[in-house]
Amino acid sequence: MALQLSREQGITLRGSAEIVAEFFSFGINSILYQRGIYPSETFTRVQKYGLTLLVTTDLELIKYLNNVVEQLKDWLYKCSVQKLVVVISNIESGEVLERWQFDIECDKTAKDDSAPREKSQKAIQDEIRSVIRQITATVTFLPLLEVSCSFDLLIYTDKDLVVPEKWEESGPQFITNSEEVRLRSFTTTIHKVNSMVAYKIPVND
């Protein structure tokens, strides 16, 4: 019985993949809300990580994000994803205005039958809460997006990975004349996520 309990408390490869994929689901929703990419009335409040977070009620967006998160979970489990990037662009000109980059490190020695890593869910959630709080706080320094914007998700994977048909190849979509701000990181001991946001420096007329 004691052995079973310790397995439940530890972090397994599959459990780690689920934790990180879930973070991206809430993190992307937070970015889309904070940056006004979708109307605020299309979001609803939920409790997660000891915070009140906003998630979309837009059915098309829910479907899209669910598909992305499920695919991401699989790639995280296989340790074959290197980074996820949320790109925010001016709808009219296509110019990239913000680039939220999450670098993902994976301990490839972790296997299904490996002993669970000793880190509590609470410790991981505390770290994730700090990252989400920082995403929320970025509105205090990021330039106001005064034009209509859209977003793209870029996922960098190992070169030999088979990618689903609906996914398209993309360039890195970097920003010209940008500032970068590093955000906090979190780790499950199997996956580590480092966060940063780059934004276009406003030009004074």
UniProtKB/Swiss-Prot annotation:
Annotated PROSITE patterns: HORMA
Its biological purpose: Component of the spindle-assembly checkpoint that prevents the onset of anaphase until all chromosomes are properly aligned at the metaphase plate. In the closed conformation (C-MAD2) forms a heterotetrameric complex with MAD1L1 at unattached kinetochores during prometaphase, the complex recruits open conformation molecules of MAD2L1 (O-MAD2) and then promotes the conversion of O-MAD2 to C-MAD2.
Location of the protein in the cell: Nucleus; Chromosome, Centromere, Kinetochore; Cytoplasm; Cytoplasm, Cytoskeleton, Spindle pole
GO-annotated biological processes: cell division; establishment of centrosome localization; establishment of mitotic spindle orientation; mitotic sister chromatid segregation; mitotic spindle assembly checkpoint signaling; negative regulation of mitotic cell cycle; negative regulation of protein catabolic process; negative regulation of ubiquitin protein ligase activity
Domain HORMA, chain residue ranges per copy: 14-197
Gene3D superfamilies to which the protein is assigned, alphabetical: HORMA domain
List of residues that carry Phosphoserine: S6, S130, S170, S178, S185, S195
Consequence when changing S178A: Reduces phosphorylation on serine residues. Abolishes phosphorylation on serine residues
GO molecular function: identical protein binding; protein homodimerization activity
Effect of W75A: Prevents interaction with CDC20 and leads to formation of the closed conformation
Pfam families: HORMA
Keyword terms of this UniProt record: Acetylation, Cell cycle, Cell division, Centromere, Chromosome, Cytoplasm, Cytoskeleton, Kinetochore, Mitosis, Nucleus, Phosphoprotein
Keyword Cell cycle found: yes
Keyword Cell cycle: yes
Segments crossing the lipid bilayer: none
GO cellular component: cytoplasm; cytosol; kinetochore; mitotic checkpoint complex; mitotic spindle; mitotic spindle assembly checkpoint MAD1-MAD2 complex; nuclear pore nuclear basket; nucleoplasm
Effect of substituting S195D: Binds to the N and C-terminus of MAD1L1. Abolishes interaction with MAD1L1 and reduces interaction with CDC20
Region (Required for assuming the closed conformation and for interaction with CDC20): 195-205
Domain notes: The protein has two highly different native conformations, an inactive open conformation that cannot bind CDC20 and that predominates in cytosolic monomers, and an active closed conformation. The protein in the closed conformation preferentially dimerizes with another molecule in the open conformation, but can also form a dimer with a molecule in the closed conformation.
Name of the gene: MAD2L1
Top-level taxon in the UniProt lineage: Eukaryota
Protein name per the record: Mitotic spindle assembly checkpoint protein MAD2A
Oligomeric form and interacting partners: Monomer and homodimer. Heterodimerizes with MAD2L1 in order to form a tetrameric MAD1L1-MAD2L1 core complex. In the closed and open conformation, interacts with MAD1L1. Formation of a heterotetrameric core complex containing two molecules each of MAD1L1 and of MAD2L1 promotes binding of another molecule of MAD2L1 to each MAD2L1, resulting in a heterohexamer. Interacts with MAD2L1BP. Interacts with ADAM17/TACE. Interacts with CDC20. Dimeric MAD2L1 in the closed conformation interacts with CDC20. Monomeric MAD2L1 in the open conformation does not interact with CDC20.
Lineage, opening ranks: Eukaryota, Metazoa, Chordata, Craniata, Vertebrata
Family per record: Belongs to the MAD2 family.
Record annotation: effect of changing Y199A: Prevents formation of the closed conformation and interaction with CDC20
